[in-house]
């Protein structure tokens, strides 16, 4: 599910759905149709979004009151903190149209084959997070720009900036990071479809139990 709605904090104008999310999701659905059955449900401004029933949720600009717990959640341009998110919003940092480069805080599969230092932002949301829940992957001047949580309670990625105020959508890093996110949060149940007798293989369980 892709939900985009909200107003620009500076101008008060309605923010339109981001074409970059729409395009990269459509491209991934087409390119990896044999690997993932990606069916995109876009919820328009003014319509009611769902908080259950999807494998992957994208909320842009307007955040849900409570995080969905039955799928992966991407919060893009976070402006308010969902109740059960472990996040706190400390305001907007505006660079007055000056762009700054981000830095990688750690290695993570989501950043695989990317060069994070190519990414710039000119405005972002200052976020305080619970370090026991989240890992900061990208930052600027100590402020987190991309946070990830992946545990039994929740699977969440938080982009603390809007794609409208970043060069990320114009870089190869954007589709790579979206692909890596799917690989990281929703790995294949099994790799391969033909095995020899006594050959060992791994089954990835996405639920609480796995029966074979």
PLM feature spans:
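N-linked glycosylation sequons
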Residues: 1-212
